[in-house]
Amino acid sequence: MSTPPAKRQKRDQYRKRAAAAANEDTGKVKLPQKKFYRQRAHANPFSDHQLDYPLSPAHMDWSSHYPAFVNPDPEQKNLAGARKLLKDVEVVDIGCGFGGLLVGLAPLLPETLMLGMEIRTQVIEYVENRIQALRTQQNQLKNSSTTASESPAPAIPAEPATDGASPDAASTPETSNSPVPGGYQNISALRSNTMKFFPNFFGKQQLSKIFICFPDPHFKAKKHKARIISENLNAEYAYALKPGGLLYTITDVEEYHHWVLRHFREEGEHEASEGGVKDLFERVSEEELASDPCVEVMRESTEEGKKVTRNKGNKYVAVFRRKADPEWPA
């Protein structure tokens, strides 16, 4: 009697089958299960990971990420010789985790290209398979509605609830039997180290929204340098954001929330010096946030957000608007 395969081998076999099934337009497509993509919560951003990144934003090949938005003119190519898109990526989820925010925002902003960036290998593999499965499901629904409109569309199995999630957590719009605006063609994800290579992907004033949801708090003082909010990184975010663009942050750690406010010069005894981050961002009022649908998605659609809700924890939100660049003195 042969011994059962090890857990790692089971996970590898499942991921290969899931990736292959997600690319097939026949048969029922199931969403990948997170339990087969588990990875430790931390990844050292200062390590030399084997990462692919473009020489500059003008060299980035987005055609494989957003095939539905590729420019039909084959002569339109970037500096790397790749096909250009009809529009630029405008929304970025830094540290996208398992992709809950992207999936939640996709039908809300169907004509806006959104990208998730994640450093963990198995997690980004899950997000890629999840998006591909969602696209295939939507294509099947679209095809079935046009070719056999008189018969009901086949039911699409819901993603099993994991990590103790309630049954309601699985019945999200992504498991709906009806078409979703955009068909999830406007979202994608890639593996990257934002702390090192963020400017390689996005040009000046390209983005309209940046999301930083439940980032690793790095509690130890010697680890604070690895936090994704800092003076230097805030300057890079400001470079990529359009004037009027928004940077969204949410955390369940109160100390980290105050860290965010301090590093945007919204709290503490820091003197606001000329040319500092205070000249680049202003905090958005609670009244404005109440009418922003993206805030509700950020609170409730991410996996971490759902976990905090189940545990009855607190969520601390701070959103900052990119100011227009000051005029040069005459």
From Swiss-Prot:
Q: Where is the composition biased (Basic residues)?
A: 7-18
- InterPro entries, per this entry? SAM-dependent_MTases_sf, Trm8_euk, tRNA_(Gua-N-7)_MeTrfase_Trmb
The record's subcellular locations are:
Nucleus
Query: One GO CC term of this entry?
Result: nucleus
What is annotated as the active site? D216
Reactions the enzyme catalyzes:
guanosine(46) in tRNA + S-adenosyl-L-methionine = N(7)-methylguanosine(46) in tRNA + S-adenosyl-L-homocysteine
Tell me which residues bind S-adenosyl-L-methionine.
Answer: G95, E118, I119, N193, T194, C213, T302, E303, E304
Q: What sort of enzyme, by top EC class, is this?
A: transferase
Q: Where are the transmembrane segments?
A: none
Q: Where is the composition biased (Polar residues)?
A: 172-185
| Low complexity bias (residue ranges) | 144-162
**Protein EC:** 2.1.1.33
> Which domain of life, per UniProt?
Eukaryota
Q: Which UniProt keywords apply?
A: Methyltransferase, Nucleus, RNA-binding, S-adenosyl-L-methionine, Transferase, tRNA processing, tRNA-binding
Which residues lie within the region annotated Disordered? 1-27, 138-185
What Gene Ontology molecular function terms does this protein carry? tRNA (guanine(46)-N7)-methyltransferase activity; tRNA binding
Q: In which pathway does it act?
A: tRNA modification; N(7)-methylguanine-tRNA biosynthesis
Listed under subunit, the entry gives: Forms a complex with trm82.
| Purpose | Catalyzes the formation of N(7)-methylguanine at position 46 (m7G46) in tRNA.
Q: Which PANTHER family match?
A: 3-DEOXY-D-MANNO-OCTULOSONIC-ACID TRANSFERASE/TRNA GUANINE-N 7 - -METHYLTRANSFERASE, TRNA (GUANINE-N(7)-)-METHYLTRANSFERASE
Family statement drawn from the similarity comment of this UniProt entry: Belongs to the class I-like SAM-binding methyltransferase superfamily. TrmB family.
**What protein does this entry describe?**
tRNA (guanine-N(7)-)-methyltransferase
Please give the organism: Aspergillus oryzae (strain ATCC 42149 / RIB 40) (Yellow koji mold)
